[in-house]
Amino acid sequence: VPGPFDAWLVLRGLKTLAIRMERHCRNAAVIAAHFERHPNVAQVLYPGLPTHPGHKLAASQMRDFGGMVSLLVRSEEQSIAAVGRTKIWKLAESLGGVESLIEHPARMTHASTADAPFAAPKNLIRLSVGIESADDLIEDLEQALVRSHSASVSG
């Protein structure tokens, strides 16, 4: 049973939920579209993209496409380096907050399935997109990908 203060926090948060979700989803769509054309990204996984294999189904079931975006980059080394080079994106294993989070699932949330047939790809980066400026988030992720690509090529 939640206490009175916890209940008050939930009630207060509900007042801004719609605007936060709108921004969360819009930012994810902008980021997914941007990185779909990025030379260091092999594939973007986001159901809001028309190129996603589940786009039609998602569009028939959802008003919006959420704030989770996954990137398959060129190598495991690049993915590990990139998640450690962001300044705005926080390296964390959570989702659903207002802040943007980045993780390397193969070493973090899905490490226990590393040898399974359904294991997370080692070159996968997972993003939980927050409500910060989409331009700032893109710029931060851009610099991390460029620096990580340079490091993986030279190292």
Regions found by a protein language model. Give the residues of each.
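PLP-dependent enzyme catalytic core of the Aspartate aminotransferase-like
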Residues: R20, S100-G155
